[in-house]
């Protein structure tokens, strides 16, 4: 009997992947190929995506795992992508203008001048989404101001996940989790905001029916099936924005904050309430819609391992193994003998170290950076608790930064709550697959699907006495 799987097509900024996941959340087959944006013809500093190239990359991935897939019964397909990007299309779904990439600087001026249409504070209070130059709203305002005839001609605006879903099924839809990144939703109503659309002159008719995660969009059509080398008629289930599925796929429960630790740290939570009026008071804050109706994902982000990489280059070399830095910092007592670091290297004039003496070593500088970043996390978690009306009892940690066991322990000590680390990197794919299984009727809810997965976490508990932490 063939093994049943959900096939997740994941379009990331650096890689496009096809991954087959079984009912227990185990990966049965996977393939990956690099993804890259193109330089726009109009201006060599502008970036855009080629939809045809992305679809070809998916086809290449599916063909790489074709022999494994022929041994499987593919119950459903789910598509995940990065947020915000999309394109205007005609009635056949043909692009009227290329997909402007989130990396493209052309929309920065629109963001800077948005106050002439609607106040930035009001915008965030309604939509939840922070002021980021790549937001969908700014792309549409840019198109309206520079190519007004395209907005008039357009049948629809499709987010990138919906562009892919349209090519698979022929259906025009809007993934709710993608719309949640757009800065055009009334986040409390889970629908496009008449106030924002009216102020910016964007017609509501451009946005096709909203689909919730786990809802069936349609089935795989002949041309797409031939391109991917898959059987015709496979149900295509709505997923959408990768962040929301990473939260669910990591096992995050309601009111359990999740920290994705990498070059940037992104702190988010799945909360039943959110005070969007507070968001604009905190730089780097945002709020998106959760994968499940009735929940929100408020969050904030800041530069983290990017600071540590700079410290490494400054005192060691860019190639020095991290373990060497960690071992030197372990020898320093908590508090780094009074050396403190203000870690906001991007926007604070007072960034850097204080309390340096003739006895200060490079280990002190690195430990102070770890402690300074953790103090930043502590402040941001307190803000998030206020915004999301919850109290954290533990922190779920994912991403490359979670491999630093000393930093994990410092986090547990300073936050005074357990830190649990999930090593599995495929949280987005896992989350999308769980909604896929729910969508094809295998389970009564995404939670029931998730209950089949055995999560393995490593725990770091607060330590009252300073001690050297053994490698876990």
From Swiss-Prot:
Its EC number is 2.7.1.51. The keyword ATP-binding applies. This is L-fuculokinase. It comes from Escherichia coli (strain K12). Keywords: ATP-binding, Carbohydrate metabolism, Fucose metabolism, Kinase, Nucleotide-binding, Transferase. Pfam families: FGGY_C (PF02782), FGGY_N (PF00370). It comes from the Bacteria. Its cofactor is a divalent metal cation. Coiled coil: none annotated.
């Amino acid at each position: 009997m063939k093994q049943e799987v959900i096939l997740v097509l994941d379009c990331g900024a650096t890689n496009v992947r096809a991954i087959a996941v079984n009912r227990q959340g185990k990966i049965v087959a996977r393939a990956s190929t690099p993804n890259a944006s193109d330089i726009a013809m109009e201006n060599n500093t502008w970036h855009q995506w080629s939809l045809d190239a992305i679809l070809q990359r998916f086809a290449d991935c599916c063909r790489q795992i074709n022999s494994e897939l022929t041994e499987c019964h593919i119950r459903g397909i789910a598509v995940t992508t990065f947020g915000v990007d999309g394109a205007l299309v005609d009635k056949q779904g043909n692009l009227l203008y290329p997909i402007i990439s989130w990396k493209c600087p052309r929309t920065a001026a629109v963001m800077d001048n948005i106050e002439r249409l609607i106040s930035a504070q009001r915008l965030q209070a309604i939509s939840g989404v922070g002021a980021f130059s790549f937001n969908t709203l700014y792309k549409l305002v840019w198109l309206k101001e520079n190519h007004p005839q395209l907005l008039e001609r357009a049948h629809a605006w499709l987010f990138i996940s919906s562009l892919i879903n349209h090519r698979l099924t022929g259906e025009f839809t809007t993934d709710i989790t993608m719309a949640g990144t757009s800065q055009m939703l009334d986040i409390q109503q889970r629908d496009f905001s008449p106030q924002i659309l009216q102020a910016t002159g964007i017609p509501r008719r451009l946005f096709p029916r909203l689909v919730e995660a786990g809802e069936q969009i349609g089935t795989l059509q002949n041309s797409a099936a031939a391109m991917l080398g898959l059987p015709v008629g496979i149900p295509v289930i709505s997923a959408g924005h990768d962040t929301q599925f990473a939260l669910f796929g990591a096992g995050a429960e309601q009111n359990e904050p999740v920290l994705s630790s990498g070059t940037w740290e992104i702190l988010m939570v799945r909360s039943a309430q959110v005070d969007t009026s507070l968001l604009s008071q905190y730089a780097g804050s945002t709020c998106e819609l959760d994968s499940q109706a009735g929940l929100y994902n408020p969050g904030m982000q800041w530069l983290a391992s990017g600071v540590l990489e700079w410290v490494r280059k400054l005192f060691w070399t860019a190639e020095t193994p991290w373990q060497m830095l960690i071992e030197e910092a372990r020898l320093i007592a908590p508090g780094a003998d009074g050396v403190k670091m203000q870690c906001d290297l991007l926007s604070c004039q007072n960034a850097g170290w204080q309390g340096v003496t003739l006895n200060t070593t490079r280990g002190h500088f690195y430990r102070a950076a770890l402690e300074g970043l953790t103090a930043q996390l502590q402040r941001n978690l307190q803000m998030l608790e206020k915004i999301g009306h919850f109290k954290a009892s533990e922190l779920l940690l994912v991403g490359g930064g979670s491999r630093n066991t000393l930093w994990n322990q410092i986090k547990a000590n300073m936050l005074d709550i357990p830190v649990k680390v999930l090593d599995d990197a495929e949280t987005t794919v896992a989350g999308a697959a769980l909604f896929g299984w729910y969508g094809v009727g295998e389970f009564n809810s995404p939670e029931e699907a998730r209950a089949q997965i055995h999560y393995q976490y490593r725990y770091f508990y607060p330590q009252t006495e300073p001690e050297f932490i053994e490698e876990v």
